[in-house]
């Protein structure tokens, strides 16, 4: 499959639910008007879509939500997608709250990698941002996923006057563990318009000042638009998804 620019497309994101067990300030703090279950694709329908997509050259799938793990049977869906001829990789984006509970099932199903959202290491601030006191569970999930050998990326959204100063502590996740820490610029859509994000250009300059020798990491880390850097002495890498200041289509 090719896009209008002639680029090969081999990657599809599938949102399996609009439900979420958090209420992040910049996302859906008051909840959203949920779709009736009758209007949400069944797993059988999703699998048929995947079968057709593979026929057009899609080989990699990412399972998202909402929070995908609040929908029963998520691991079984992953198992069935992985069994499709031609599928090379199935990954998932999660807030991590339920990940440790279902990790063994997901590994058995063949999950290849996981992206975990984490904006702060401060327990009180986590509850302020997400609406729930669940930071310890998220950290347990990250540790469990890393220990299992699963490839892990930690997604971070920084906000001025909220968690901007925490970038150093969060970056340390990549120092001794094989984790990609990815800083994602705040998108000014929905409730995100009320928040002030942090420029990735400014953040990169701060990292370069603190860690001389930072260089581009040209290894393939996934299918998305992130630009990665290697910090001398770090096991993992740091990535930037510059939704505001980046140019994705040049």
Regions picked out by a protein language model, each given a short descriptive name:
Residues 1-13, 23, 55, 226-228, ...:
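N-terminal [4Fe-4S]-dependent radical SAM core
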Residues 249-250:
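Cysteine-cluster motifs in flexible loop/terminal segments that predominantly coordinate metals
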Residues 35, 72, 100, 190-191:
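Short, solvent-exposed loop/turn segments at secondary-structure junctions
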Residues 4-43, 56:
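Canonical Radical SAM [4Fe-4S] cluster-binding loop centered on the CxxxCxxC motif
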Residues 67:
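Conserved G/P- and acidic residue-centered "switch" motifs that form tight phosphate/ATP-binding loops
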Residues 40-63, 71-177:
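Radical SAM/AdoMet-radical enzyme domain recognition
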Residues 124-127, 133-139, 143-237, 243:
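Radical SAM enzyme [4Fe-4S]-AdoMet core and its adjacent flexible, acidic
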């Amino acid at each position: 499959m090719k896009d209008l620019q002639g680029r090969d497309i081999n990657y599809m994101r599938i949102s399996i639910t609009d439900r979420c067990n958090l209420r992040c300030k910049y996302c859906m703090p008051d909840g959203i008007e949920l779709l009736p279950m009758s209007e949400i694709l069944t797993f059988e329908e999703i699998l048929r879509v995947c079968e057709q997509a593979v026929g057009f050259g899609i080989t990699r799938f990412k399972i998202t939500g909402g929070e995908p793990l609040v929908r029963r049977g998520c691991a079984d869906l992953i198992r069935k997608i992985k069994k499709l001829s031609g599928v090379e990789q199935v990954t998932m984006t999660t807030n991590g709250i339920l990940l440790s509970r279902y990790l063994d099932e997901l590994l058995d199903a063949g999950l290849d990698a996981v992206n975990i959202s984490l904006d702060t290491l401060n327990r009180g601030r986590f509850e302020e941002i997400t609406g729930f006191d669940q930071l310890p569970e998220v950290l347990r999930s990250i540790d469990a996923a890393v220990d299992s050998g699963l490839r892990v990326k930690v997604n971070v959204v920084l906000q001025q006057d909220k968690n901007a100063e925490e970038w150093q502590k969060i970056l340390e996740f990549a120092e001794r563990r094989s984790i990609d820490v990815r800083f994602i610029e705040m998108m000014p859509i929905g409730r995100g318009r009320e928040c002030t994000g942090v420029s990735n250009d400014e953040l990169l300059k701060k990292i370069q000042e603190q860690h001389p020798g930072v260089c581009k990491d040209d290894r393939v880390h996934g299918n998305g638009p992130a630009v990665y850097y290697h910090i001398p002495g770090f096991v993992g890498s740091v990535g930037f998804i510059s939704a505001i200041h980046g140019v994705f289509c040049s």
